[in-house]
Design a protein with these regions (language model features):
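N-terminal Rossmann-like NAD(P)+-binding domain of SDR-like oxidoreductases, especially those catalyzing
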Residues: 1-144, 272, 276-277
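C-terminal substrate-binding subdomain of Rossmann-fold SDR/epimerase-dehydratase oxidoreductases
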Residues: 7, 161-282
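Solvent-exposed, non-membrane alpha-helical residues enriched in polar/charged side chains
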Residues: 49, 92, 129, 155-159, ...
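Structured catalytic cores of enzymes that bind and process phosphorylated ligands/cofactors
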Residues: 83, 112, 143-146, 157, ...
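A general structural signal for well-ordered alpha-helical segments in protein cores
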Residues: 88, 154-155, 215, 219
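NAD(P)-dependent short-chain dehydrogenase/reductase
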Residues: 114-118, 122-191, 221-223
Length: 282
């Protein structure tokens, strides 16, 4: 099957591209990190049109987004809002024109009206429902990341440990999140693609581990990984509380677990990321 991964160089996209290729699919990558002509904010974009037109299935992962640090800094800016609205208008129009089967990568934050990021993802969900596509809602997927400016909490903490010896947190760490290893996320997305006709646009397809953990506990798990290699790393919480999600806590739907279940424990997933990142500092 010819599968397009829009946002193929992002955290999830890179894993998904490799995963689907190993499964025998012909994967078409598309990401601004590859070439400037793969900038999805450019309207019209003939290259994007050709990729979507020639695809049997499309994973719409592309978004201008990062972890909490990135969102806190940029989500209220004009460029953040403009980039994402242009990406969506461009892509959804082509998906409509060529009547493609697709999955839109949304977020568990899409119901948070105080969050520009959440509102934009909600808008993407409305586009998707109008076209009969499917929506997956991600809950803090983690894995190897290339762009540290947009890094999420686990890779951010590991990087800080190696580079400064201090996990300098941006909050007090009392907020809770559900984390999912990227490989498990890929298997969930493949499952949705393979069972596409079993689902409807209104289905709550939450992609998560269904286990909640405090951010301070994530810091201590990573601290233990450093202990195991003989490197002393301190954990330094901030006095600030969570401003990105404002301690809002959603409840994940388990509907997708009728087809898929995560298999990687948090400790094992963090260990995989830690081991991979360690190679950059040896």
């Amino acid at each position: 099957m010819k599968v397009s991964v829009l946002g193929s160089s992002g955290q999830i996209g890179a894993y998904l591209t490799e995963h689907l290729t190993m499964k025998g699919h012909l994967v078409r990558e598309f990401d601004i990190a590859n070439n400037t002509y793969e900038d999805m904010t450019h309207i019209p974009n003939a290259f994007l049109r050709n990729v979507i037109m020639d695809s049997d299935f499309v994973f719409f992962l592309a978004f201008d987004v990062g972890g909490s640090r990135y969102l806190k800094k940029y989500q209220h800016t004009y460029d953040f809002i403009n980039n994402n609205t242009r990406i969506m208008a461009n892509t959804f129009d082509l998906l409509k024109t060529y009547d493609k089967k697709f999955v839109f990568a949304s977020s568990q934050m899409s119901n948070l009206s105080f969050s520009p990021y959440g509102l934009l993802k909600n808008l993407g969900e409305l586009y998707t429902k109008s076209l009969g596509g499917l929506i997956t809602k991600f809950w803090n997927v983690y894995g190897i990341e290339k762009d540290y400016e947009k890094s999420h909490v686990i890779t951010d903490f590991i990087r800080k440990g190696f580079e400064t010896g201090v996990i300098d947190m941006i909050t007090d760490g009392q907020e809770e999140r559900e984390f999912l290893y990227a490989q498990d996320c890929c298997e969930a997305l493949e499952t949705v693609m393979n069972n596409y006709n079993d689902f409807k646009s209104d289905d709550e397809l939450h992609v998560t581990s269904f286990n909640s953990v405090k951010i301070i506990d994530i810091a201590h798990i990573i601290q233990q990984k450093f202990d195991m290699i003989g490197k002393k790393v301190d954990v330094k919480p901030s006095i600030d509380t969570d401003t990105v999600q404002q301690n809002s806590k959603n409840v994940a739907s388990k509907y997708l677990t009728n087809w898929w279940k995560p298999t990687t424990s948090l400790d094992d997933g963090i260990a995989k990321v830690f081991t991979s990142m360690k190679k950059n500092y040896d």
